[in-house]
């Protein structure tokens, strides 16, 4: 029997090698893939913090997003109840706040107490009302049962940073008394702190060293993160040498479609060609950490990756010279700030976003030894998975991807071998399939995620578990749309939403519809 199975697998692989590997939309071809799940190898646990989120005081993420005291949809503390209910579906495990670039001009002291005053937001050229600060964020995290993750102003001195730690975590002292006076007698127990956002250079590294040392002396239980790699940069090896002993995480940021000045909306194939980029980016960070381990600057396994800003599309914020106060009445400034709202358009977020997000999360799961946190940026509005408007919410396509992964996958990742035809677009190509297999602790219940990236063709996928071709009918959930450009908006909020179905496998073969994400549940092999 084993010989027959191996023969079948060999035929499938040979057919993939000798068939036309170009799967352009202007020709009809047989699209095939082979997924082999190594059920005899030990599955490894992953950290659910890879399903985390990020909120910044930018656009309508905070004000007009999660927090809107004047809205009839808000509770008595100002939180939008519809937003809270939707985010609970994502079981958001951790939220990073308050930035992001915003944090470069943020002073935490302005966001606590009763007599808060508006300040100039030197990063984004708006007025920050400071009505949402430390305690409001903690209240949000408590509503969502999420771990708070604070990011320090990287331009502030170490004293300001440690004062915030004292205010948040101390039982007694000047800042603990201040917190108690503000209505919070018990420590806030904030455990994860980042020293700045997207900063670099020797002076910054020395600040990381000093701040990390100071924070851990105050509270030995805190976990320290710092800027490591963003965009096309590399981690400065000196960071590990000078500050490595105080670090628990290294931060990685990447957005794969650049929207900084010019708002762009590439087509489906252009977006899908980026699907394998996260894997190589993560491997790059892992290699740099491993080099530091080999050189003895850090202990093996000491530093994990916090991919604490990620998304297919970067934020759109054309503008002015930052770090300078602007004239808020200047028509040009008003025009530039208003232009940021282009990214709120629901029609932008289609199956590209849903399937790219699945591939990003698959990359995190495959590399879960090192990557233990990831935060989609942002969680709400701009390019985030949840669009919030004055009268309600819209769950964008990638909202459903995250919701499916959080609620459908099991807790351990199994090694999986994937062989598939290539999907091409000009000189670029990616595998037509992506897959991840998860299993429960007892090794009995499986949840397998299968992504067909092809825009227009069904994918004939052969699934082998160990040495056994999968046969039978199993419960599944599928996310797709009528076309690659399908999206959700106010008038049509459910054009792209998960559907339950029964999926039939015969001799290991299952048909996956085009531009789709499918998670299938298997309880007996």
Question: Which residues fall in each region the model found?
Answer:
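Active-site His/acidic residue clusters
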Residues: 254-270, 320-322
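Bacterial Sec-dependent N-terminal signal peptides
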Residues: 1-30
């Amino acid at each position: 029997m084993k010989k027959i199975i191996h023969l079948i697998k060999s035929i499938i692989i040979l057919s993939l090698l000798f068939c036309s590997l170009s799967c352009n939309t202007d020709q009809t071809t047989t699209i095939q893939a082979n997924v082999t799940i190594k059920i005899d190898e030990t599955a490894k646990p992953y950290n659910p913090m890879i399903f985390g989120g990020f909120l910044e005081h930018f656009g309508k993420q905070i004000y007009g997003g999660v927090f809107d005291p004047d809205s009839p949809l808000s509770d008595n503390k100002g939180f939008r109840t519809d937003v809270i209910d939707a985010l609970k579906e994502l079981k958001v495990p951790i939220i990073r706040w308050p930035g992001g670039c915003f944090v470069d001009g943020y002073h935490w002291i302005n966001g606590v107490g009763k007599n808060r005053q508006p300040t100039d937001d030197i990063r984004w050229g708006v007025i920050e009302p400071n009505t949402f600060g430390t305690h409001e964020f903690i209240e949000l995290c408590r509503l969502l049962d999420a771990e708070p993750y604070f990011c320090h102003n990287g331009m502030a001195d170490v004293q300001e940073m440690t004062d915030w730690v004292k205010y948040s975590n101390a039982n007694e002292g000047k800042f603990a008394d201040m917190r108690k006076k503000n209505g919070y007698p018990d420590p806030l127990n904030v455990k994860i702190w980042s020293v700045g956002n997207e900063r670099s250079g020797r002076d910054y590294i020395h600040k990381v060293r000093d701040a990390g040392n100071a924070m851990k002396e105050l509270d030995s239980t805190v976990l320290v993160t710092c800027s490591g790699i963003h965009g096309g940069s590399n981690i400065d090896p000196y960071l590990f040498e000078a500050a490595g002993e105080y670090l628990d995480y290294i931060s990685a940021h990447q957005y794969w479609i650049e929207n900084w000045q010019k708002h762009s909306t590439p087509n489906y194939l252009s977006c899908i060609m980026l699907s394998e980029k996260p894997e190589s980016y993560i491997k790059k960070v892992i290699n740099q950490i491993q080099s530091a381990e080999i050189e003895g600057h850090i202990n093996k396994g000491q530093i994990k990756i916090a991919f604490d800003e990620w998304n297919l599309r970067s934020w759109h914020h054309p503008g002015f010279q930052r770090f300078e106060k602007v004239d808020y009445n200047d028509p040009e400034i008003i025009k530039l700030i208003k232009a940021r709202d282009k990214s709120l358009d629901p029609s932008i977020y289609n199956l590209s976003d849903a399937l790219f997000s699945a591939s990003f999360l698959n990359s995190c799961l495959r590399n879960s030894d090192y990557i233990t946190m990831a935060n989609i940026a942002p969680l709400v509005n701009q390019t985030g998975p949840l669009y919030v408007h004055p009268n309600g919410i819209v769950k964008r396509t990638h909202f459903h991807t995250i919701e499916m992964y959080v609620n459908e996958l099991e807790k351990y990742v199994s090694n999986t071998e994937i062989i598939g035809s290539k999907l091409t677009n000009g000189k670029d190509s990616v595998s037509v399939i992506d897959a991840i297999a998860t299993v429960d602790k007892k090794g009995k219940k499986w949840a397998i995620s299968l992504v067909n990236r092809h825009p227009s063709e069904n994918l004939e996928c052969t699934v082998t578990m160990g040495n056994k071709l999968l046969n039978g009918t199993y419960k599944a959930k599928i996310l797709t749309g009528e076309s690659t450009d399908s999206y959700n908006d106010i008038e049509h909020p459910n054009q792209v939403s998960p559907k339950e179905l029964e999926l039939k496998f015969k001799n290991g073969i299952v048909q996956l519809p085009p531009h789709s994400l499918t998670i299938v549940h298997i309880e007996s092999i």
